[in-house]
Amino acid sequence: YLLMLFSEILGQDYIKNHLTASALSGRIPHAQLFVGPEGSGTLAMAVAYAQFILCQNVGVENAGGNESCNLKFQSFSHPDLHFIYPTVTTEDVKTKPKSLDFIADWRSFLSGNPYGSLFDWYQILGVQNKQGEIRVEDAQEILKLLALKSYEGGYKITILWMAEKMNVAASNKLLKLLEEPSDKTVFILIAENE
């Protein structure tokens, strides 16, 4: 598995230093927007930041914190880390697709190419002419997950990749969550365009 450590993300030292400093000082904004063109590493940066927070790591090596927590990040399976991303109907998921329906494919996608594009993701899903989108079912799933206590007693982090693919119903439901977040909840929205 490929680890997503700050030290493995090329350049962007100012951003890495800012993120680690805010985490170490305990000033972690509950909602953040990472914007960058395809291939700029916004997803890798978001995962490295989530790992830094959840595992209580120090420095750009993302080490020195909770080792079992760091191990869970190798397979992107930390129980307090949630992902939302565009999905489509497929042979297996015929109606109301949501991110959790494709979590194994997502982890494989992340492991294989943390700088992967939306096109690469659609290839894995086997999308022909369909447009992927983030639907209200994802927002409802996140509401349920965030209502639970964190597994490790710390933060709960949701990374929303390709935020511009949210439909209106999903964005309305998520907006309410962003406006009134529960304690120790962090949302990282990733977009290619502001």
PLM segments and residue spans:
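Sensor-1/coupling segment of RecA-like P-loop NTPase cores
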Residues: 160, 166, 180-194
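Conserved ATPase-coupling elements of RecA-like P-loop NTPase cores
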Residues: 166-172
